[in-house]
C-alpha cells in the first residue's frame, strides 16, 4: 500500500540529506533523500544547501513516490528510515518512463 504525504522535516547539514515524513496507516515513517539523489532527480549538480527546500518542493511528488516504492519493496521495520540515494533514481525513471524533470 502506498505511503501518504506527511510533513517536511528540513535539511540536515550533517547527513547532507533532506528529511521528510510519510504516513503508513497513520504511523509516521521517517524519510531522507541525499543531496546527490535530489540533484540527480532534478538534472543538476552541486545545488547549495539553501536551495534544498525549494528543490524538494519542486520534485516532491516524485521523491515521495520513490520513498513509497522503496518502503513497499522492503520489509518495513518500525523506526527504520527510508533513505533515497542516487542508485534509486535510474530505476524510478525506468519504471515511470521519465528521462528528466
Predicted regions and their residues:
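Short, charged/polar N-terminal "headpieces" of proteins
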Residues: 1-27
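A generic short-segment signal for beta-strand/edge and adjacent turn/coil regions
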Residues: 1-3, 31-32, 50-54
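Short, exposed beta-strand "edge-strand" segments with a Pro/Gly-rich flavor and a Y/T-containing core
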Residues: 5-7, 25-33, 75-86
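Flexible, active-site-adjacent loop/turn segments at secondary-structure boundaries
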Residues: 9, 36-39, 54, 82
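A short, structured beta-strand/loop element
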Residues: 19-44
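Acidic, low-complexity intrinsically disordered segments
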Residues: 44-101
Amino acid at each position: 500500500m502506498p505511503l501518504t504525504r506527511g510533513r517536511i522535516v528540513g535539511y540536515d547539514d550533517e547527513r547532507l540529506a533532506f528529511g521528510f515524513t510519510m504516513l503508513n496507516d497513520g504511523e509516521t515513517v521517517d524519510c531522507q533523500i541525499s543531496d546527490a539523489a535530489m540533484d540527480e532527480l532534478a538534472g543538476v549538480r552541486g545545488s547549495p544547501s539553501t536551495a534544498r527546500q525549494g528543490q524538494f518542493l519542486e520534485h516532491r511528488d516524485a521523491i515521495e513516490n520513490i520513498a513509497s516504492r522503496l518502503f513497499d519493496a522492503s520489509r518495513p521495520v518500525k523506526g527504520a528510515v527510508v533513505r533515497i540515494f542516487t542508485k534509486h533514481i535510474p530505476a524510478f525513471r525506468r519504471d515511470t518512463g521519465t528521462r528528466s524533470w
